[in-house]
UniProtKB/Swiss-Prot annotation:
The active site is at T7. Coiled coil: none annotated. A double ring-shaped homohexamer of HslV is capped on each side by a ring-shaped HslU homohexamer. The assembly of the HslU/HslV complex is dependent on binding of ATP. Protease subunit of a proteasome-like degradation complex believed to be a general protein degrading machinery. It is found in: Cytoplasm. This is ATP-dependent protease subunit HslV. Allosterically activated by HslU binding. One of its GO terms (biological process) is proteolysis involved in protein catabolic process. Its EC number is 3.4.25.2. CDD domains: protease_HslV. It comes from the Bacteria. Belongs to the peptidase T1B family. HslV subfamily. The gene is hslV. The lineage of its organism: Bacteria, Pseudomonadati, Pseudomonadota, Betaproteobacteria, Burkholderiales.
């Protein structure tokens, strides 16, 4: 059976602001099943942003597990991420999940990979999913050459990814944190 897959999620941090956005397309093989999926969420009293890419059911499972760890550790992002990946590496069911998360709070942006890794990206920017490389390239160019706010960079990066990646559409959800 084919998996639901593909998306673009991008996170940009500039100054005391962070923006996380994603497109709304869900595909099954070469068929668009839904164009308005919401892959960006606010967690832990609206203090943490999370975006997911990968097999849809796996991504929801991973996000729910992360949210439980976040609650357990009173919103401490790094600790929750490390605890989740520890479980991910030791739990047989979790090890088979085909999904990735980008999570961000006021201080940190983290990528949680399908291998159970916790990565803190450089340049205040991260992108995952089938259009992630396009979005990351666009965002990096905008970060280096403009003074645009992070939410504008996320929007423009998603637009570029949507123009290039057949698994990414132009229906965007963008959330922000910070002043």
């Amino acid at each position: 059976m084919e998996q639901f897959h593909a998306t673009t999620i991008v996170c940009v941090r500039r100054g005391n602001r962070v923006a996380l956005g994603g497109d709304g397309q869900v595909t099954l093989g070469n068929i668009v099943i839904k164009g308005t999926a919401r892959k960006i969420r606010r967690l832990y009293h609206d203090k943490v942003l999370a975006g997911f890419a990968g097999a849809t059911a796996d991504a929801f499972t991973l996000q729910e597990r992360f949210e439980a760890k976040l609650e357990k550790h009173q919103g401490h992002l790094m600790r929750a991420a490390v605890e989740l990946t520890r479980d991910w590496r030791t739990d047989r069911v979790l090890r088979r999940l085909e999904a990735m998360l980008i999570v961000a709070d006021a201080e940190h942006t983290l990528v949680l990979t399908g291998n159970g890794d916790v990565l803190e990206p450089e340049h205040g920017l991260a992108a995952i999913g089938s259009g992630g490389a396009y979005a990351q390239s666009a965002a990096l160019a905008l970060l280096r050459n403009t003074e645009l706010p992070p939410e504008t960079i996320v929007k423009q990066s998603l637009e570029i990814a949507g123009d290039l990646c057949i698994y990414t559409n132009q229906n965007h959800v963008i959330e922000t944190l910070g002043g």
